[in-house]
């Protein structure tokens, strides 16, 4: 169990590093965020099943629902930005520009 937790924490850390490194492109950032959410989902499900905390068994599913909503909104934003500007740079999302 300890090695599985360590692998999931490493996956989360690598996805977080990917967000920090590839923050100029929206698609790369969305993929790294999905990796973070997936590792959090698996880690929460494993911890809940290992400690038999069935009162909080809905928490991973709620996290998965929010992750799906985040992915949907992110992809809609990516499509809108790509059609308007022709690229997926995050700097195009600045709302202060006219």
UniProtKB/Swiss-Prot annotation:
Its EC number(s): 7.1.1.2
Q: Which keywords annotate this record?
A: Electron transport, Membrane, Mitochondrion, Mitochondrion inner membrane, NAD, Respiratory chain, Translocase, Transmembrane, Transmembrane helix, Transport, Ubiquinone
According to the lineage, what is the superkingdom?
Answer: Eukaryota
Q: Where are the bilayer-spanning segments?
A: 1-21, 28-48, 59-79
**One MF term from GO for this chain?**
NADH dehydrogenase (ubiquinone) activity
Q: One of this protein's GO BP terms?
A: ATP synthesis coupled electron transport
GO CC terms for this protein? mitochondrial inner membrane; respiratory chain complex I
Q: How does it sit in the membrane?
A: Multi-pass membrane protein
Its EC top class is translocase
> Where does this protein reside within or beyond the cell?
Mitochondrion inner membrane
Primary localization class, coarse = mitochondrion
Query: Which reaction is the catalytic activity of this chain?
Result: a ubiquinone + NADH + 5 H(+)(in) = a ubiquinol + NAD(+) + 4 H(+)(out)
Record's keyword annotation contains Cell membrane: no
**Homology family:** Belongs to the complex I subunit 4L family.
Q: Which PANTHER family match?
A: NADH-UBIQUINONE OXIDOREDUCTASE CHAIN 4L, NADH-UBIQUINONE OXIDOREDUCTASE SUBUNIT ND4L
What does this gene product do?
A: Core subunit of the mitochondrial membrane respiratory chain NADH dehydrogenase (Complex I) which catalyzes electron transfer from NADH through the respiratory chain, using ubiquinone as an electron acceptor. Part of the enzyme membrane arm which is embedded in the lipid bilayer and involved in proton translocation.
Quaternary structure and interacting proteins, as annotated: Core subunit of respiratory chain NADH dehydrogenase (Complex I) which is composed of 45 different subunits.
The molecule here is called NADH-ubiquinone oxidoreductase chain 4L
Q: Which organism is it from?
A: Lagostrophus fasciatus
